[in-house]
Regions:
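Bacterial N-terminal signal peptides that target proteins for export
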Residues: 2-13
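Beta-strand/loop-rich accessory regions of lumenal/periplasmic or secreted enzymes
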Residues: 129-137
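Sec/Tat signal peptide C-region and signal peptidase I cleavage site
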Residues: 22-26
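Acidic/charged, solvent-exposed loop-and-adjacent secondary-structure segments enriched in E/D, K/R, S/T
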Residues: 107-130
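Short alpha-helix boundary/capping motifs
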Residues: 1, 102-105, 111
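Acidic, serine/threonine-rich low-complexity disordered tracts
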Residues: 27-103, 138-227
Length: 227
C-alpha cells in the first residue's frame, strides 16, 4: 500500500477563475513538508517548510557543484496567512543578501549595503509565496512585494498559464501552471493536483541566473506522498 499523509484529506483541485487567480482547495498548514526537486542540468534542490506553534520557516537549498546556495525565511502564522519577518540568501555559508520586515518597514540589500523602505503590504520571497498560494486558495496577499534580498519587486497579479506534465517516479502527472508578475519579470509556478496540490514547478530569473526546479519527491509530516 502506498504511503500517504493525513495532512491533506483530498487532492487540491486547481482551477481557473474568471479573474485569472489561482484557486485551490485550501489545505491546513503542516508541521513539516519536504520537497525534493531536480534543477537545471540535474542539480538537486530541496525545499522544506516547518511549523512550530505560530512560527514557521521555509528553506530552499540548491547544490550547485562547488557552490552551495541556501535561501532561508521565516515569520509568524496567523490563520492561513504567512507573515514573514526575515529572508536570507546564503552562499557557501556566508550571507550574500538579506531582508528584514517590521510593520511598514523593509530593510534589505547585499551584505553591508542595506537600505530601508516603507511598504504597504507584506514582503515575501518566491519560495514562501509558493506555500502561501497553497494555504490561501491561491489568493495573493494585498499590496504584495517580492524580494530576493537585493531588491523589492511589486507583484502585479497572477494568471493561468495552461497545463503541462512532469515525470514523477516514472509516471506522467499533470501540473497546472500560473504566472506571477513581479516587476518587469515573471515567475512561474506549477501545482500538481495528483500530489495534493504542492508546488511541482518553480521557475524564475535572478539577474543573469535562471532557476528551473521540477518536483521529484514529496513528504508531509513524515509521510511520503504519491499520485
Amino acid at each position: 500500500m502506498r504511503k500517504t499523509t493525513s495532512f491533506y484529506l483530498k487532492p487540491l483541485l486547481v482551477v481557473m477563475l474568471a479573474a485569472g487567480a489561482l484557486s485551490v482547495q485550501a489545505a491546513p498548514i503542516p508541521d513539516q513538508a519536504t520537497l525534493q526537486f531536480r534543477g537545471s542540468y540535474g542539480i538537486p534542490a530541496t525545499m522544506t517548510f516547518k511549523r512550530s506553534g505560530s512560527q514557521y520557516t521555509v528553506s530552499a537549498s540548491i547544490n550547485v557543484p562547488f557552490y552551495k546556495i541556501r535561501f532561508e525565511s521565516g515569520g509568524t502564522i496567523s490563520g492561513n496567512q504567512l507573515n514573514p519577518s526575515y529572508y536570507r540568501d546564503v552562499r557557501n555559508g556566508k550571507v550574500y543578501a538579506s531582508a528584514q520586515f517590521s510593520g511598514s518597514k523593509a530593510t534589505y540589500g547585499k551584505a553591508g549595503e542595506t537600505k530601508t523602505e516603507n511598504v504597504r503590504g507584506r514582503v515575501m520571497d518566491l519560495f514562501t509565496l509558493a506555500w502561501q498560494l497553497v494555504f490561501t486558495d491561491g489568493q495573493l496577499p494585498p499590496n504584495l512585494m517580492i524580494t530576493n534580498g537585493k531588491r523589492l519587486y511589486p507583484v502585479r497579479g497572477i494568471s493561468p498559464a495552461g497545463t503541462s506534465q512532469i515525470t514523477f517516479n516514472g509516471r506522467k502527472i499533470d501540473v497546472n501552471q500560473f504566472n506571477v508578475r513581479r516587476g518587469d519579470d515573471t515567475a512561474q509556478y506549477g501545482f500538481a493536483p495528483a500530489l495534493n496540490g504542492v508546488p511541482a514547478i518553480i521557475r524564475y530569473n535572478d539577474g543573469d541566473k535562471n532557476y528551473a526546479l521540477t518536483l521529484k519527491s514529496v513528504s508531509i509530516n513524515g509521510q511520503t506522498v504519491q499520485p
